Regions:
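A short, proline-enriched helix->beta-strand linker immediately N-terminal to the Walker B motif
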Residues: 85-90
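Conserved ABC transporter NBD signature motif
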Residues: 1-10, 14-15
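N-terminal cationic-hydrophobic initiation segments that often serve targeting/anchoring roles
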Residues: 42-45, 83, 117-118, 136
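ABC-family P-loop ATPase nucleotide-binding domains
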Residues: 14-17, 23-80
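ABC transporter nucleotide-binding domain
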Residues: 110, 114-126, 130-190
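Conserved N-terminal glycine/acidic-rich loop preference
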Residues: 20, 63, 71, 77-78, ...
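Catalytic Walker B motif of ABC-type/P-loop ATPase nucleotide-binding domains
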Residues: 92-96, 101
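Helix N-cap at the start of a conserved alpha-helix in ABC-type nucleotide-binding domains
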Residues: 103-105
């Protein structure tokens, strides 16, 4: 695996400036507020865009003076994403970035990612998500991984055009041509 054309162990400080990362449980001390984080980001990233960061905080209703320890799970998730987007990274690595967000916040965040990619066509996003609809409008390729193995790799357009999820009762399932079924999941309800 290479990152920005290099082996990970070869990345230098300047290369790492080009990475934006969100992890589900990582970040700043919870005793800091967003204004404190802005001061840190200005020192960490030479390309930190404070104006855009503040604007995004405002759009996602992230208070600047409140300590992170008093943030909800969703507010913390939004802040992690805004930090990743704050310094014009060439590669975003996002682990479940919309987990814990309500539908409105999730859609706003996805719009920000789409906007980010439109303004930076030479950038890439590596994103993990259990919410497949989050991926449809963002990704060119989708990899499905199960137990550490790639079980499906397909262009997003092909995936949307040629694959589907069917929810049927047992009688309808028995009538289906099983040749085209990749996976089944029996549920106890509905």
């Amino acid at each position: 695996i290479t990152v920005l054309g290099k082996m990970p162990c070869e990345l230098n400080g300047k290369d790492k400036q080009k990475l934006g990362v969100t992890l589900s449980e990582a970040g700043f001390s919870t005793y800091l507020n967003v204004k404190d984080i802005i001061r840190i980001l200005k020192k960490l990233y030479y390309d930190f865009d404070e104006g855009e960061f503040r604007s995004r905080c405002d759009r996602l209703r992230i208070p600047l003076d409140k300590n992170i320890k008093d943030f909800s799970t969703g507010m913390r998730a939004k802040l992690r994403m805004l930090v990743a987007l704050s310094h014009n990274a060439k590669l975003l690595i996002l682990d479940e970035p919309t987990a814990g967000l309500d539908v409105d916040a999730r859609n706003r965040l996805l719009d920000m990612l789409r906007d980010y990619m439109e303004k930076r066509p030479d950038s890439s996003i590596l994103i993990t998500s259990h919410i497949s609809t989050d991926l449809e409008g963002l990704c060119d390729d989708i990899y499905m991984i199960h137990d550490g193995n790639v079980v499906l790799h397909e262009d997003t357009d092909v995936l949307l055009d040629k694959y589907a999820v069917l929810k049927v009762d047992e009688a309808a399932y028995e009538k289906l041509d099983k040749t085209y079924i990749l996976k089944t999941n029996k549920e106890s309800f509905g």
